[in-house]
C-alpha cells in the first residue's frame, strides 16, 4: 500500500495540471494565425473561436477580417487587417475574451482594418496582463500579383515566426520584393497583335485583355477576382 501512495499523489497532480488551462475566445470577425511559433489552422470558412492556453506567457498572432459591401459591385468582399501580436500572461484557468476596442460592432470595418485596436477581458472581471503590437505585414491583392509578377506573401508563416521569437514583440515587415514593369508605356497606345497575344503566357494574356477593357469591364473583373480569394 505504501508504494501506491506516491503514484496516486502523482496522478492527482497530473490531473490537476492538465485541468489548469485557460481559453482565449475571439468573435467571428477575428482570425487566429499563430500561437507561440506554430501556425493555427483556421480560415473564413472554418473559424476557430478559441485557443487553449497553459499557464505562462503566450504570443498569439491574430488579424481582423470582415465581409463588407464591394465598392465596384453589389456583391460582398472581405477586408483584412495586417496581423497583430498579442502577448498574454496566463496565471489561472480563466476565460479570456477579445473584441474590438470600440465594442462588439465595428462601424467602419475598412478604417478599423488599417489600425485594429482590441481589448481583452476576463470572465471573472479580473485584471488581464497583455500587450498588443501591430505589424505592417500585408497580403498583396490577387489583382496586384497578376500584374506585378510577385509571389504571394505567407502571412501565417511569418506570423508564426514572429510569435516564436524570444524577447520583446516587434513589428514584422515583409521582405522587399524586386519588381519590374512588364508593360511598356508604348503598349498603352500602340496596337497589339492578337496573334502574338495568343502565344503569350497567362499573365501576359491578362495584361493584354486588361489594356483592351473599358473602365466598367475592369471594375467587374476586379470584383470577380476579389471574390475568388
Curated annotation (Swiss-Prot):
UniProt key word Signal: yes
Any Pfam family: DUF2057
Keyword Signal included in the entry's annotation: yes
Record's signal peptide: 1-21
Keywords, alphabetical: Signal
InterPro entries for the chain: UPF0319
Superkingdom per UniProt: Bacteria
Family: Belongs to the UPF0319 family.
HAMAP family named among the record's database cross-references: UPF0319
Name under which the protein is recorded: UPF0319 protein Shew185_1615
Lineage of the species this protein comes from: Bacteria, Pseudomonadati, Pseudomonadota, Gammaproteobacteria, Alteromonadales
Amino acid at each position: 500500500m505504501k508504494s501506491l501512495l506516491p503514484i496516486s499523489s502523482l496522478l492527482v497532480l497530473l490531473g490537476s495540471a492538465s485541468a489548469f488551462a485557460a481559453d482565449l475566445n475571439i468573435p467571428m470577425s477575428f482570425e487566429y494565425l499563430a500561437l507561440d511559433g506554430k501556425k493555427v489552422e483556421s480560415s473564413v470558412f472554418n473559424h476557430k473561436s478559441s485557443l487553449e492556453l497553459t499557464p505562462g506567457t503566450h504570443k498569439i498572432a491574430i488579424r481582423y477580417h470582415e465581409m463588407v459591401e464591394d465598392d465596384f459591385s453589389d456583391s460582398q468582399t472581405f477586408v483584412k487587417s495586417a496581423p497583430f501580436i498579442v502577448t498574454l500572461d496566463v496565471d489561472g484557468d480563466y476565460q479570456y475574451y477579445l473584441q474590438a476596442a470600440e465594442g462588439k460592432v465595428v462601424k467602419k470595418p475598412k478604417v478599423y482594418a488599417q489600425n485594429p485596436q482590441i481589448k481583452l477581458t476576463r470572465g471573472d472581471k479580473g485584471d488581464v496582463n497583455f500587450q498588443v503590437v501591430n505589424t505592417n505585414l500585408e497580403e498583396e491583392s490577387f489583382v496586384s500579383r497578376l500584374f506585378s509578377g510577385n509571389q504571394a506573401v505567407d502571412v501565417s508563416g511569418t506570423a508564426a515566426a514572429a510569435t516564436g521569437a524570444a524577447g520583446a514583440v516587434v513589428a514584422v515587415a515583409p521582405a522587399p520584393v524586386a519588381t519590374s514593369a512588364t508593360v511598356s508605356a508604348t503598349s498603352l497606345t500602340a496596337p497589339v497583335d492578337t496573334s502574338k497575344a495568343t502565344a503569350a503566357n497567362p499573365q501576359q494574356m491578362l495584361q493584354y485583355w486588361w489594356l483592351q477593357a473599358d473602365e466598367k469591364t475592369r471594375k467587374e473583373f476586379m470584383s470577380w477576382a476579389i471574390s475568388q480569394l
